[in-house]
Amino acid sequence: MISKETFEIFPSVDIVDGIAMTSNSAIRLTRGESSTLRRPLGTPAEVALAWQNAGAKWIHVVDLDAASGRGSNSHLIADVLAAVDINVQVCGGIRDETILRKVLATGCQRVNLGTAALENPDWCAQAIAEYGDKIAIALDVKSTSEGYQLATHGWNVSKGNLWDLLERLDKQGCQRYVVTDVERGGMMSSPNFTLLQEVCAKTSSPVIAGGGVSSLDDLRALADLSTIGVEGAILGQALHIGKVPLEDALAATQSPRR
């Protein structure tokens, strides 16, 4: 059973054009918005090491160039793995076996598949069967007039029904989901708690909350959902701009084991 004692914070390293940037600027740049939005934090390895030094046990690395078809930063992901000695999960543009093997070869503990779950379902099922707990599925969700739809290709395309996909993935044995309301990613508008509760009600696999965290209160509220299956939260924009320091986030959600 998931509990507050095991709730994890996943500080993010969002990579665009070879640089780690604030989540908001990274997301908007990959959507083709002005380059004046660039808000660099440093090299991916430098940023990951800073999060490790602040107490993180996991790092969440996002290759937004790969996710949006603009290129690959696999060499920089390898640099991150060489710089830290904590767990790393990687996502972005991992859509076939060749790319998956290349990313796993960096030594990362987990890979998140997103677009592939919709566009390459047979291979996705094979990956889940072969790699087990090393595979999580990113459910990037957009609310539409037709219900919850999945956002793919760096959140630039909407397709597929959330509940249909979740049912199929559960049958295929998916062991973990990363659930993000894409309208809240990088926006610090608070997580979509209703969405998280609905997903947890339909699967017994653990869920990581992605996107929208704006305060310590948001993190405490997410940790309270550990009883229904939320095992952690990705911390991006609020961390990157200093609104929620990582040390405070860890203390607020993991105090029972400190």
UniProtKB/Swiss-Prot annotation:
One BP annotation, GO: L-tryptophan biosynthetic process
Entry-linked Pfam families: His_biosynth
Gene3D superfamilies: Aldolase class I
Catalytic activity: 1-(5-phospho-beta-D-ribosyl)-5-[(5-phospho-beta-D-ribosylamino)methylideneamino]imidazole-4-carboxamide = 5-[(5-phospho-1-deoxy-D-ribulos-1-ylimino)methylamino]-1-(5-phospho-beta-D-ribosyl)imidazole-4-carboxamide
Enzyme Commission (EC) number: 5.3.1.16
Keyword ATP-binding: no
CDD domains: HisA (cd04732)
Molecular function GO labels: 1-(5-phosphoribosyl)-5-[(5-phosphoribosylamino)methylideneamino]imidazole-4-carboxamide isomerase activity
Domain of life assignment: Bacteria
Active site: D14 (proton acceptor), D140 (proton donor)
Localization per Swiss-Prot or TrEMBL: Cytoplasm
Principal subcellular localisation of the protein: cytoplasm
Pathway named in the protein's UniProt entry: Amino-acid biosynthesis; L-histidine biosynthesis; L-histidine from 5-phospho-alpha-D-ribose 1-diphosphate: step 4/9
Top class in the EC scheme: isomerase
Protein keywords: Amino-acid biosynthesis, Cytoplasm, Histidine biosynthesis, Isomerase
Record-stated family: Belongs to the HisA/HisF family.
Record's protein name: 1-(5-phosphoribosyl)-5-[(5-phosphoribosylamino)methylideneamino] imidazole-4-carboxamide isomerase 2
Gene it is expressed from: hisA2
